[in-house]
């Protein structure tokens, strides 16, 4: 492990005196492992009062197994149109890797992968493949809000495979749907904090630490002295407020009441218990999760397509009926009653709709008002839902073309002009008279 990853002071600054959302069993393993690295002589549970010596801490760690080996982390994959985002190990605010790395996953990496998947046209849905005991509070609520935002763009499902506790439960709660395996552990909706006191150990080593500060609360919770009661009460208030915020978020995401969430008292649930508690929706085998989600997305798509087709059919039928009424202007009441009582087949409805549409178009193009306004009449006829009556009113108010106006004026002039002189041969009497005229 690199020196940067073994920066123990930095790790201690994030692990102590900061609220953590960790599953209890993992928290014991975590602090036992950290105790050996930081020289902590004992661990004390503030609630139960139980203490572990350094030797007992190491024994507890040994029973839990060695976690220094390589962790299998899956890369970002798109499987059957579903983006699979692994979320494993301890959740931390930031890492340099988008993927789970060295036993931890960064909230920043989860957000970045979510945003990429949401904008990927090849992705129909997103599956968070979760195996995490939780982690830092810092960044957790923002990450959960991003999940809730993305689920409005594309379905985001969470799979507890085989754990999403504490901060992991917060993220899973923000998903559209939550799947659990039969042995998955979920829940632990609570907050914890650890305080370390090196004062006695430093005193034995002859080391004296002097803190020089300004501001009465500047060194609250420092690791070189006993935790005063008033400081502990302040930290406890922070824990209670954070837990309340945690419960409110889970309530907003899942629909459970805040009190129901608080009543879990940070309990951990397994498999079906999580469904009974309202923290999960479906029990699945982890290998079937992709298929289950794909089938659900396909069924949803079919329902949406069917709904659109039904609406379009209804709209066409209503439009055709209205158009036919406009053309004929008279619809006997008995005919409407019979139509309501009868259930015509689809072909009859289509035939009636086509006939009504043809009548509507021809009624607009051939009406008296369309003369001299042919282009406008064509546009009106192409307008969906435009009735003959409305089109005639619009055309009547519109000016005619210049050619139509000239033709109309000439017609009026010809109607008012005197009758033309008739051409023909003169009568025979007139001819005779002309011939008899003396010269």
From Swiss-Prot:
Low complexity bias (residue ranges): 313-327
Q: Which Gene Ontology molecular function entries are recorded, alphabetically?
A: identical protein binding; serine-type peptidase activity
Enzyme Commission number(s) from the entry: 3.4.21.-
Q: Name one GO cellular component term.
A: viral capsid
Q: Does the keyword Iron-sulfur apply?
A: no
Could you tell me the keywords of this UniProt record? Capsid protein, Host cytoplasm, Hydrolase, Protease, Serine protease, Viral capsid assembly, Viral capsid maturation, Viral release from host cell, Virion
Start and end residues of each stretch annotated as Disordered: 303-327
Pfam families xrefs: Peptidase_S49
Q: Which domain of life is it from?
A: Viruses
Q: What class of enzyme is it?
A: hydrolase
- CDD domains, sorted: S49_Sppa_36K_type
Query: Active site at which residues?
Result: 166 (nucleophile)
Q: Please give a single GO biological process term from the UniProt record.
A: viral procapsid maturation
Q: How does it assemble?
A: Capsid assembly protease interacts with capsid scaffolding protein Nu3. Capsid scaffolding protein Nu3 multimerizes and interacts with major capsid protein gpE.
Q: What else is known?
A: It is uncertain wether Val-260 or Met-309 is the initiator for Capsid scaffolding protein Nu3.
Q: Which family does it belong to?
A: Belongs to the peptidase S49 family.
Q: What does this protein do?
A: Assembly protease promotes icosahedral procapsid assembly. Autocatalytic cleavage may release the capsid scaffolding protein. The protease domain catalyzes the cleavage of the capsid scaffolding protein after complete procapsid formation. Assembly protease and cleavages products are evicted from the capsid before or during DNA packaging. Scaffolding protein Nu3 promotes icosahedral procapsid assembly. Acts by binding the major capsid protein gpE and multimerizing in interaction with portal dodecamer, thereby placing gpE in a context facilitating icosahedral procapsid formation. Cleaved by capsid assembly protease C after capsid completion. The cleavages products are evicted from the capsid before or during DNA packaging.
Q: What is this protein called?
A: Capsid assembly protease C
């Amino acid at each position: 492990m690199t020196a940067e990853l073994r920066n123990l002071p930095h790790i201690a600054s994030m692990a102590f005196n900061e609220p953590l959302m960790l599953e209890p069993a993992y928290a014991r393993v975590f602090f036992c492992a950290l105790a050996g690295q930081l020289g902590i002589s004992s661990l004390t549970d503030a609630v139960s009062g139980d203490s572990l010596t350094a030797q007992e801490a190491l024994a507890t760690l040994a029973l839990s197994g060695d976690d220094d080996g390589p962790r299998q982390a899956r890369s970002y994959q798109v499987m059957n149109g579903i983006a699979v985002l692994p979320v494993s190990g301890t959740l931390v605010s930031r890492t340099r890797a988008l993927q789970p790395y060295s036993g931890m996953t960064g909230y920043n990496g989860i957000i970045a992968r979510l945003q990429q998947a949401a904008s990927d046209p090849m992705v129909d849905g997103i599956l968070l493949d979760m195996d995490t005991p939780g982690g830092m509070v810092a960044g957790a609520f923002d990450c959960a809000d991003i999940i809730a935002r993305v689920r409005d763009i594309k379905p985001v499902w969470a799979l507890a495979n085989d754990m999403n506790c504490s901060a992991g439960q917060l993220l899973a709660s923000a998903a559209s749907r939550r799947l659990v395996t039969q042995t998955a552990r979920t829940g632990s909706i609570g907050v914890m904090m650890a305080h370390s006191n090196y004062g006695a150990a430093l005193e034995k080593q002859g080391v004296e630490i002097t803190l020089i500060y300004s501001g009465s609360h500047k060194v609250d919770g420092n690791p070189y002295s006993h935790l005063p009661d008033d400081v502990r009460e302040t930290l406890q208030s922070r824990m209670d407020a954070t837990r309340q915020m945690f419960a409110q978020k889970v309530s907003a995401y899942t629909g459970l009441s805040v009190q129901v969430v608080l009543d879990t008292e940070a309990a951990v649930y397994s498999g079906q218990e999580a469904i009974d508690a309202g923290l999960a929706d479906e029990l699945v085998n982890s290998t079937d999760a992709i298929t289950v989600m794909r089938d659900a997305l396909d069924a949803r798509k079919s329902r949406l397509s069917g709904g659109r087709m039904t609406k379009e059919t209804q709209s066409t039928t209503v439009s055709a009926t209205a158009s036919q009424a406009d053309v004929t202007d008279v619809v006997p009441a008995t005919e409407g009653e019979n139509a309501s009582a009868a259930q015509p087949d689809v072909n009859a409805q289509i035939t009636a709709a086509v006939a009504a549409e043809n009548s509507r178009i021809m009624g607009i193009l051939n009406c008296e008002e369309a003369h001299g306004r042919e282009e406008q009449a064509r546009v009106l006829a192409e307008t969906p839902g435009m009735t003959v009556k409305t089109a005639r009113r619009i055309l009547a108010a519109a000016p005619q073309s210049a050619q139509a106006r000239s033709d109309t004026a000439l017609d009026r002039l010809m109607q008012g002009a005197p009758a033309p002189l008739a051409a023909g041969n003169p009568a025979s009497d007139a001819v005779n008279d002309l011939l008899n005229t003396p010269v």
